[in-house]
Every structure is written in structure tokens, then in C-alpha cells.
């Protein structure tokens, strides 16, 4: 955590720099948990998020804050995050957001070592597009005999589409969102 002393003062040099989702290069000093911000320099290039895109950005930040260890660098994930912010800012229609959010959630879980198994079930059998599955934590997809046999049911096509990041099918979008919500809740485990 950084403390920005005097940042709210009208003549503060850093007042306009400390905005959400803007890249800044910072310098700090101090010891312990709370450090003091010494310098901040705007890196530019990131359009401001507004509307639904802003809420999506906050969602990404919440996931990162709660799931990543403090002060642990994840360069690939940060690159994915900056691309995601650019896509959110560039898409006022909101059509791409669901697909991008699922993609980011998958990348985050993979970076944390919880990569999803989506192309074969827990027995090692390839996923069948018309079969029904439930996703068991730390185990992967388990094939069901009937759709009603479990609470979190997805069709095989959804798992394969999620693997390929193809969200053109409305059922895939709906089931992927529900599945990823369940997975995120499991890994957050009360950290919300």
C-alpha cells in the first residue's frame, strides 16, 4: 500500500495522475506495510473507462487484489490485463466484454496454477459436444448420465468453446459465465 501525501491539494504535482486504470511509473520510500509515494509519472496511452467498462475494470482489479500474492510479479498476466483494459475502453457496445472477461479469468487461473481442463473429462476421455458434465474443483469435468444429476451442469460444447475461447453461441456464454463464477468463488474462498 502506498500513501500519497498531499495528493488532494490543488497545487499537487501528482493530483491529476492518480486516476483509476491509468499507467504510471512510481517511486516510493519507507519501511513496513504502508510506504510513501515519492514520485509518479504518467505513462500515457490508456483511454479512460466509463459505464459498464468501468465496472468490468473494477471486477478485474478485485480478482487480482484477492487472488494474487502481494508484491508478486506476474508479467504475462499484467500484459493480458493491459490488453483487456484497452479492449474495454475501445468497445462502447459491450459485445466483446463477456468473451474478454472469460478469457481473462482463464488466464488468471492458469497463472495461479489452477489451469482448467476443458478438452477431456476427469477419466481422460475426450469431451463430447452433446454430453452433459459437471465441473468438480481440482478434478475437472465429470460426465453425467442426465442433465439434472448435478447443480452445475454444462454441455460438452460449452467446455470446448471455453477452451477455444469461442463465445458466439448464447448457451456457451451463459454456461461459461456460470461455470467461471463458481470457479472464482471457490478460489476466492471468502476473500471477497
Q: What positions do the PLM features span?
A:
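Non-catalytic alpha-helical scaffolds and adjoining flexible linkers that form interface surfaces
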Residues: 1-192
Amino acid at each position: 500500500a502506498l500513501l500519497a501525501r498531499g495528493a488532494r491539494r490543488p497545487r499537487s504535482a501528482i493530483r491529476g495522475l492518480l486516476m483509476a486504470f491509468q499507467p504510471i511509473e512510481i517511486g516510493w520510500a519507507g519501511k513496513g506495510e504502508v510506504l510513501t509515494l515519492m514520485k509518479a509519472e504518467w505513462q500515457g496511452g490508456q483511454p479512460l473507462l466509463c459505464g459498464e467498462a468501468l465496472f468490468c475494470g473494477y471486477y478485474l482489479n478485485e480478482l487480482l487484489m484477492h487472488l494474487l500474492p502481494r508484491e508478486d510479479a506476474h508479467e504475462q498476466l499484467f500484459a493480458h490485463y493491459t490488453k483487456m483494459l484497452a479492449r474495454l475502453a475501445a468497445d462502447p457496445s459491450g459485445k466483446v466484454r463477456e468473451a474478454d472477461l472469460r478469457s481473462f479469468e482463464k488466464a488468471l487461473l492458469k497463472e495461479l496454477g489452477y489451469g482448467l481442463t476443458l478438452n477431456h473429462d476427469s477419466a481422460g476421455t475426450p469431451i463430447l459436444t452433446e454430453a452433459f458434465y459437471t465441473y468438480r474443483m481440482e478434478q475437472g469435468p465429470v460426465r453425467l448420465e442426465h442433465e439434472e444429476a448435478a447443480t452445475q451442469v454444462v454441455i460438452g460444447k460449452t467446455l470446448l468453446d471455453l477452451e477455444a475461447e469461442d463465445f458466439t453461441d448464447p448457451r456457451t456464454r451463459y454456461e461459461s459465465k456460470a461455470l467461471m463464477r463458481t470457479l472464482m468463488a471457490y478460489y476466492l474462498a471468502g476473500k471477497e
